[in-house]
Regions:
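C-terminal binding/interaction regions
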Residues: 1-80, 84-157
Length: 157
């Protein structure tokens, strides 16, 4: 059987998925964004030298990521508004890159993949915004879902 897009009607029109008949269950998701910021910024971040006019980079990006997750349904048109029970954003430097890992949790009728992905994306965009005065050569790479649990199926990358 051919798979179908869940947010498109048979007539090709966008539609929100009706979740009214679903039971509320525990839903979790984890996502990651990787950034290549170059050696100059990386060494400044590693040495805690960067506290810019806009504030401390990683701490600001963590807050921005959580805020982004909470506002996902306002950014992605057909995404259901959900009550997040938890959202975490961790930022580390690994193998010469910035690695942003996020998690989102709810008990609800729909998953939290988009919230975890939005948290990772917004945190990465915030790092870019705060460091662009040093270099515009920053690259946000590999924004990806690592895992989702709950609902019809589970997924692990």
């Amino acid at each position: 059987m051919k798979k179908k897009l869940s947010h498109v009607t048979p007539a090709g029109q966008p539609t929100m998925v009706n979740v009214s008949e679903k039971k509320a269950t525990l839903r979790t998701a984890r996502a990651r964004a990787t950034m290549n910021v170059g050696n100059e910024i990386l060494s400044m971040l590693s040495d805690n030298e960067i506290v810019l006019k806009k504030g401390p980079v990683f701490q600001t990006a963590i807050i921005a990521g959580v805020m982004g997750a909470k506002r996902t349904s306002g950014l992605i048109p057909l995404c259901h508004p959900i009550g997040l029970d938890d959202c975490k954003v961790e930022i580390n430097v690994k193998s010469g890159k910035i690695v942003i890992e996020t998690s989102a949790t709810t008990v609800g009728k729909t998953g939290v993949e988009m919230e975890a992905l939005t948290a990772a994306s917004v945190a990465a965009l915030t790092v870019y915004d705060m460091c662009k005065a040093i270099s515009h050569g920053i690259v946000i790479e590999n924004i990806m879902l690592l895992e989702k649990r709950g609902g019809k199926s589970d997924f692990t990358a």
